[in-house]
């Protein structure tokens, strides 16, 4: 099995590509892989623009109780939010107030019919209409994460 640092580097590479493609402010992967010490309450992977606050090590929120995460688990499809201040599914207040996110895309990572984790794409410059290119990049990142998970399962 691959070590957790190696896997985290692979996750970070996927998220860096997603950050560049979408021109977002921050991308994260939260995922449960107990054998590697990964838990959804602390990002297993992250990429940020200079000046953006990292979410790594910020474990004060039980992520699975957050409304957006419950929506992902129920719907099993991406959640695209152009304006977090008026979003129908509320994002955590800290994401907006402390980390400055104003728009986001979230996509579940489903393994064996369970939501093992999710990818987040945050934009902090203002509201944003996410494009088809942006959502395709998110879908591709989920596929890349699935490929990494398949490799470490072998």
Predicted regions mapped to residue ranges:
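Short amphipathic alpha-helical segments
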Residues: 4-20, 25, 32-35, 93
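GAF sensory/regulatory domain recognition
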Residues: 16, 20, 28-60
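Tryptophan-centric aromatic hotspots in well-structured domains and transmembrane helices
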Residues: 42-48, 68, 115-118, 130
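Regulatory sensory and allosteric helical modules in signal-transduction proteins
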Residues: 50-97
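A short, aliphatic-rich beta-strand micro-motif
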Residues: 102-110
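Sensory-domain boundary capping and coupling elements
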Residues: 109-123
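Regulatory loop-to-helix N-cap segments in sensory/regulatory domains
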Residues: 123-141, 148-153
């Amino acid at each position: 099995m691959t070590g957790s640092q190696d896997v985290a580097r692979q996750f970070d590479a996927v998220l860096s590509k997603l950050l560049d493609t979408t021109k977002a402010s921050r991308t994260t992967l939260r995922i449960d892989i107990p054998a590697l010490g990964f838990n959804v309450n602390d990002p297993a992977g992250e990429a940020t623009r200079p000046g953006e606050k990292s979410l790594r090590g910020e474990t004060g929120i039980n992520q699975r109780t957050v409304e957006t995460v419950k929506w992902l688990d129920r719907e099993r499809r991406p959640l695209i939010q152009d304006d977090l201040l008026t979003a129908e599914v509320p994002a955590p207040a800290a994401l907006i107030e402390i980390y400055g996110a104003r728009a986001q895309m979230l996509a579940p990572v489903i393994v064996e019919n369970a939501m093992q984790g999710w990818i987040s794409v945050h934009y902090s410059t203002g509201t944003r209409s996410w494009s088809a290119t942006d959502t395709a990049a998110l879908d591709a990142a989920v596929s890349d994460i699935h490929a990494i998970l398949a490799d470490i399962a072998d």
